[in-house]
Amino acid sequence: MAISSSTSGTSSSFPSRTTVMLLLFFFAASVGITDAQVGVCYGMQGNNLPPVSEVIALYKKSNITRMRIYDPNRAVLEALRGSNIELILGVPNSDLQSLTNPSNAKSWVQKNVRGFWSSVLFRYIAVGNEISPVNRGTAWLAQFVLPAMRNIHDAIRSAGLQDQIKVSTAIDLTLVGNSYPPSAGAFRDDVRSYLDPIIGFLSSIRSPLLANIYPYFTYAYNPRDISLPYALFTSPSVVVWDGQRGYKNLFDATLDALYSALERASGGSLEVVVSESGWPSAGAFAATFDNGRTYLSNLIQHVKGGTPKRPNRAIETYLFAMFDENKKQPEVEKHFGLFFPNKWQKYNLNFSAEKNWDISTEHNATILFLKSDM
């Protein structure tokens, strides 16, 4: 369509410079300039962690605009008021049975969500973390997850917040029985009766599935068949071909296997939020400072671009975790922090948030990146 220019008083087929700039601005906005895609999980299993107020200040100082917490800690919620930090709020596994009672779920939402909205920006409610019907430690809780999810969602809807706050649950990848090649990804047969109804519910309310994805553990359990560069995003060439799709890193292969598993469970429309991912700096095989820094910095740059199966779609991702936590077990679990408890950056990395105005791509977003200044 021709745009008239008034500079000469006659019609022209060429737009003015001002018009072009305006069009570029609105086009850039239309293709997805959004908040940073990367957040950081705030675990609190340490006896030497900074006061909550200092932690929130550190998030803000570091331009980390999204957070995940694992229970409705009152001090954290109070400190988040007015911070503009978007939050994944966890429902502890220990609360699941109680929340199968609709009245209890309504009270939980009233106390922990309504009481803080909208000065706290709740993004998701994660109802349970890594529940598995085939894990002896959590199997007895599996029966409570979906009823609790339904009741929390109903309470959120009764509050009129269903469009602002989505309800989900966080899984780990042990529920995926086959992951190679990624297109053959499928959930274990013995978890389908648990997981399929959850997938159906998430699809019906248009909520994403939360998934904790750790290439570190996959590599550490099988270093003979998986190369370290493939796990760290440093492979210079394709490692795995899956039809026409080439995989240069384990993260993409893992996530695409999950997408394939969801398709086989009638959940192909679901988005996946990577609710945890990280690499330890000590405590076990391949857990080193250099590997941690390499993985995290590459992950943050990588997730703005999607996977081979779902390209050009930023992947909302939460790094695990903000601090080393000295009360966790086993030893390796103590060393996932991006910061030491004294608030020093473990990797001497510089967090920054900036707009990406490259309109040549379809996935423009505000990118939170890690840049080493070592």
From Swiss-Prot:
The active site is at 130 (proton donor), 276 (nucleophile). Possesses beta-1,3-endoglucanase activity in vitro. Is thought to be an important plant defense-related product against fungal pathogens. It catalyses: Hydrolysis of (1->3)-beta-D-glucosidic linkages in (1->3)-beta-D-glucans. It is found in: Vacuole. It holds the Pfam family Glyco_hydro_17. Glycans are attached at residues 63, 350, 364. This is Glucan endo-1,3-beta-glucosidase, basic vacuolar isoform. Disulfide bonds: none annotated. It is an enzyme of class 3 (hydrolase). Changing residue 352 to G: In strain: cv. PR 261 and cv. RRIM 600. It comes from the Eukaryota. Its EC number is 3.2.1.39. SUPFAM superfamilies: (Trans)glycosidases. Glycosylated in cv. GT.1 and cv. RRIM 600 but not in cv. PR 261. Asn-350 is glycosylated only in cv. GT.1 due to the presence of Ser-352. In cv. PR 261 and cv. RRIM 600, Ser-352 is replaced by Gly so Asn-350 is not glycosylated. GO terms for molecular function: glucan endo-1,3-beta-D-glucosidase activity. Belongs to the glycosyl hydrolase 17 family. Residues 357-374 form a propeptide. PANTHER family: GLUCAN ENDO-1,3-BETA-GLUCOSIDASE BG1-RELATED-RELATED. Keywords: Allergen, Glycoprotein, Glycosidase, Hydrolase, Plant defense, Pyrrolidone carboxylic acid, Signal, Vacuole. Residues 1-36 form the signal peptide. The keyword Hydrolase applies. It comes from Hevea brasiliensis. Monomer.
